[in-house]
């Protein structure tokens, strides 16, 4: 039986990575022996290239293709084999982040960047079975990022407002897959809500 792919999405500072770390320690989730991963990947040729691009003034198309190459490698080396072995895979960011972020970075280069990037992936990516969208006002996310001293070029107010709008559009277009989480609440509260939704999903599937 094919495994299940669960993804956590949201703008920077939404708290999804904090909850992803909590899920790795949660006994109810650990009982399923899931595979935890993230995008961009870490410690890989493609993932390292993406991280360098994020920290530099890389051309928007070059940046997209680096992210996409990392996604392809991630699918081939980890996600597909795990799913074929019946594993549950939980990924901190996945293809929806590319649609949302590159949908904004490419808006001055393409007429409809969101659909263009989605079309680029459509024939070969794996659509998640369940996606949590950690929704938060960009003003709050920027404040959080500033406190941890990790603000990047993607963490500007107008940019994040656009990214958030695309994330919410993706969720509205696919309500069967997306669960929208109010990410302004405490990580502990959100963890309980996410665990509850995951257990409900797995009991049905």
Swiss-Prot record:
Which protein are we looking at?
Probable thymidylate kinase
Task: Identify which top EC class this enzyme belongs to.
Answer: transferase
Task: Please report which protein family the annotation says this sequence is part of.
Answer: Belongs to the thymidylate kinase family.
**Which Gene3D superfamilies does the record cross-reference, listed alphabetically?**
P-loop containing nucleotide triphosphate hydrolases (3.40.50.300)
Q: Where are the transmembrane segments?
A: none
Q: Does the keyword Transferase apply?
A: yes
Report which superkingdom the organism of origin falls in.
Answer: Archaea
What biological processes does GO assign it?
A: dTDP biosynthetic process; dTTP biosynthetic process; dUDP biosynthetic process
Query: EC number(s) of the enzyme?
Result: 2.7.4.9
| Keyword list, A-Z | ATP-binding, Kinase, Nucleotide biosynthesis, Nucleotide-binding, Transferase
Annotated residues for binding of ATP: 10-17
* The encoding gene: tmk
Catalyzed chemical reaction(s): dTMP + ATP = dTDP + ADP
GO cellular component terms, alphabetically, are: cytoplasm
The keyword Coiled coil is assigned to this record:
no
Q: Which GO terms describe its molecular function?
A: ATP binding; dTMP kinase activity
């Amino acid at each position: 039986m094919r495994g299940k792919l669960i993804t956590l999405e949201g703008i920077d500072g939404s708290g999804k990575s904090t909850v992803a770390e909590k899920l790795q320690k949660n006994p109810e989730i650990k009982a399923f022996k899931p595979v935890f991963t993230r995008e961009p990947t870490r410690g890989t040729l493609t993932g390292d290239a993406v991280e360098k691009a994020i920290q530099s003034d890389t051309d928007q198309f070059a940046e997209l293709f680096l992210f996409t190459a990392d996604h392809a490698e991630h699918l081939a080396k980890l996600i597909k084999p795990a799913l074929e072995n019946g594993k549950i895979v939980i990924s901190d960011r996945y293809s929806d982040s590319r649609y949302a972020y590159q949908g904004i970075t490419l808006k001055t280069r393409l007429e409809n960047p969101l659909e263009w990037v989605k079309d680029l992936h459509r024939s070969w990516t794996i659509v998640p079975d369940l996606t949590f969208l950690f929704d938060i006002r960009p003003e709050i996310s920027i404040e959080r990022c500033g406190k941890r001293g990790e603000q990047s070029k993607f963490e500007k107010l107008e940019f994040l407002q656009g990214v958030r709008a695309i994330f919410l559009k993706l969720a509205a277009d696919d309500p069967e897959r997306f669960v929208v989480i109010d990410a302004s609440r405490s990580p502990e509260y959100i963890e309980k809500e996410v665990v509850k939704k995951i257990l409900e999903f797995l009991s049905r599937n």
